[in-house]
């Protein structure tokens, strides 16, 4: 990936420096005072012909199927235009499809990653079986918000794969905070808690997903859920396949929040490595001790 514009470089390092003492402005971020911070932020990059080039992207050479459609209120076309060019800039070979029949036509042996943004709608039995079979055999999948977590409400096998299902967003578009709860995982490492102005997804979630970020609900819009903590970002396994999900991204403008965009990019990279890295081993039996509580 090349970053040849000053503005792009500024965006890339914003997350890494925003919570430090040295705050880099657009006019001063090349100053001597900021040099040490910039050097640290750019450690993964090398200079080439006046540009910044990221080394060894996990997406280099990966074959990606990007399937979009469903309810257009989630702006799948605008989100497509954010992520497809980015993946291609990282060296991925991306096939874009506006039909779920793409799952019937894909060659799972030649595919590394599926990205789906398809809110609501219906999927046929053959389409669903082809999708789940590919992931179970090692094709990764990544997505966000309703495009993955509220796709096919009647298909419980699909929801079993995702690891969760949207059920409510009390208050609609509101201000809320996202809390990073795993600071060691590469997807969230180096990130701090951040604020969103969007839909706060209340979800029913598989207890064995690896939770990376959460949000806490108030009692303003539904008093019985006040204080409830719900996962926002998780990763999981489905057979041999990696599954990454973030509930952020109600509309494309949500990805103007640097942390929301960075989390999604990192999750996509992680999911693309299903066939190339061993599956992580974790178990989080969150209900195991319930019967033992006094």
Each model region followed by its residue ranges:
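N-terminal export signals
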Residues: 2, 28-49
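Short, solvent-exposed loop/turn elements at domain surfaces
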Residues: 71-77, 96, 220-223, 253-257
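C-terminal segment of N-terminal export signals and the immediately downstream linker at the start
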Residues: 3-5, 15-23, 45-68
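Residue-level signal for short, function-critical loop segments
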Residues: 68-71, 249
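Extracellular ligand-binding/catalytic regions of CAZymes and related secreted enzymes
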Residues: 59-62, 89, 221-230, 237-294
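Catalytic beta-strand/loop cores that center a nucleophilic Ser/Cys/Thr
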Residues: 59-60, 88, 93, 167-239, ...
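Helical hinge/lid and interdomain linker segments adjacent to catalytic or ligand-binding clefts
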Residues: 24, 66, 75-149
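A glycine-rich, often tryptophan-bearing local segment used as a flexible ligand/cofactor-contacting loop or short
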Residues: 121-190
């Amino acid at each position: 990936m090349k970053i040849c514009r000053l503005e792009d470089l500024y965006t890339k390092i914003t997350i890494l420096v925003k919570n430090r003492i040295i705050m880099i402005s657009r006019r001063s971020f090349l100053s001597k005072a900021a040099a040490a911070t910039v050097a640290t932020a750019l450690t993964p990059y090398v200079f080439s012909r006046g540009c910044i080039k990221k080394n060894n992207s996990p997406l280099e050479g990966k074959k990606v199927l990007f399937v979009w459609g469903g309810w257009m209120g989630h702006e799948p076309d605008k989100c497509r235009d954010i992520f497809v060019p980015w993946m291609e800039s990282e060296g991925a070979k991306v096939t874009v499809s506006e039909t779920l029949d793409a799952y019937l036509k894909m060659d799972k042996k030649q595919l590394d990653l599926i990205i789906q943004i398809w809110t609501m709608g219906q999927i046929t039995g053959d389409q669903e079986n082809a999708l789940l079979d590919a992931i179970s055999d090692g094709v990764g999948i990544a997505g966000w918000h309703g495009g993955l977590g509220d796709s096919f409400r009647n298909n419980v096998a699909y929801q079993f794969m995702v690891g969760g299902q949207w059920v409510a967003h009390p208050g609609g578009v509101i201000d809320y905070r996202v809390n990073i709860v795993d600071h060691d995982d590469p997807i969230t490492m180096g990130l701090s808690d951040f604020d969103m102005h969007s839909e706060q997804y209340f979800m029913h979630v598989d207890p064995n997903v690896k939770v990376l970020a959460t949000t806490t609900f108030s009692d303003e819009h539904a008093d019985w859920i006040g204080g409830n903590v719900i996962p926002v970002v998780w990763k999981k396994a489905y057979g041999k396949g990696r599954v990454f999900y973030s509930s952020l991204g109600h509309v494309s403008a949500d990805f103007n929040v640097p942390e929301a965009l960075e989390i999604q990019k990192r999750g996509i990279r992680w999911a693309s490595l299903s066939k190339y890295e061993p599956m992580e081993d974790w178990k989080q039996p969150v209900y195991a001790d319930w019967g033992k509580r006094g």
